[in-house]
């Protein structure tokens, strides 16, 4: 009996979840599905430039598992580009990383989703409603 898949830690959920070749009606396009953890593997390795060991550590998987996820993602992207297919980002076995935050005003410690760490997002303290908090 197969072991259930372990959830991979993901720091980023893409806002745009669908790409398609220009000039082809949606009804005529076949799709390739990229899981959220495959998108995360591409982001960490190819965009952030981390080593495979650093990527595996961030995603809380072994290095060989990370390599399999990355290879699968790259193959799917290549297939979509070469064969003119759309890319859809959805699904998978993942958990959204949490960021530990401490309120400057009252000292309360709380968690927010990791993707809210960007400079334009606000992290309000649930105790005093202050938004000046640190990671």
From Swiss-Prot:
Pfam families: DUF134 (PF02001). InterPro entries: RNA_pol_sigma_r3/r4-like, UPF0251, WH-like_DNA-bd_sf. It comes from the Bacteria. Belongs to the UPF0251 family. PANTHER family: PTHR37478, UPF0251 PROTEIN TK0562. This is UPF0251 protein Hore_18270. It comes from Halothermothrix orenii (strain H 168 / OCM 544 / DSM 9562).
